[in-house]
Design a protein with these regions (language model features):
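Auxiliary Fe-S-binding modules of radical SAM enzymes
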Residues: 67-149
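Conserved AdoMet/S-adenosylmethionine-binding subsite of the radical SAM
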Residues: 1-100
Length: 149
């Protein structure tokens, strides 16, 4: 299906993931009719067809920023020369998520989300990294601007 869409002119692909590690990805998404290998194959196909590839990275501090998870993400980004990573907060009950992911994914100490982003920038200087969430200063500026209208 993706191949046909790319042949018809699709020029951008966005993939959401919580991890670049198969067991952690699959325990969260619980895919039916596809698996992590299909995600990887789709990324490879999109790259061969020169589509713009963006990842929605669902971030859960303490899991997403584990050293092994960071390195797996870096390898995925480099392997498929991902163009953009858009970070998103994983909005889920933290206790539920920690129970589901226990013992899954790549191990290692938490590095912090700031270090995760720094590592991505270092390993893939071409990568665009963004987040739609606005920082406190930007939110305050927007609020002040609308109050004076």
């Amino acid at each position: 299906m993706l191949d046909a869409l790319l042949q018809e002119g699709l020029d951008a692909v966005r993939v959401s993931l919580n991890s670049a590690v198969k067991d952690l990805y699959e325990c969260y998404y619980q895919p039916i009719g596809y698996g992590w290998e299909d995600v990887e194959a789709s990324l490879a196909l999109a790259r061969r067809r020169r589509a713009y590839i963006a990842l929605n990275l669902l971030v859960f501090p303490g899991v997403t920023d584990r050293l092994g998870e960071v390195e797996a993400l870096v390898e995925l980004v480099r392997r498929h020369r991902i163009d953009q990573v858009q970070t998103r907060s994983l909005a889920i009950d933290p206790m539920q998520y920690l129970e589901v992911v226990r013992g899954r994914g790549a191990p290692g100490p938490g590095t912090g989300v700031e270090q995760l982003i720094r590592r991505l920038k270092q390993a893939a200087p071409w990568l665009v990294i963004g987040n739609f969430a606005r920082g406190l200063n930007e939110r305050l500026q927007c609020r002040m601007a609308t109050e004076h209208v």
